């Protein structure tokens, strides 16, 4: 069962929450505004999937910045694919938007590097990939590492775009 005793060892990527077959992990916001996983011991099966999938030991401290051009985005969408990128929610929190129509791209925030509400995004990405659709996922390196861990590595049809990051700001700011 996952227990966060040192917050510097958790990036809040939600991979553990998404991997848990018992669905006993929820993300809770701390006083500083960061989300961390908390497991319900009454529901936990002690299968270890949450700790196995954690990408933190593999995250390298580097900045690798790419951009997805409008033309590339349009091509993915025209081919029936979807794009996931940070987007401002109406309640002024940052979540992930799923875009499958060219007219929806305007709401994406390509340069937003704050801790975002990912919640079911990893499950949705997996569903679309299993359905044979192309998926573009843009995010900070730890979210990309978490998604790759959740999916079991690189996947055909998945394009990952990292935004530069030197540590995300709290969404509570």
What kind of region is each of these model predictions?
Residues 31-44:
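Short linker/helix segments within small regulatory modules
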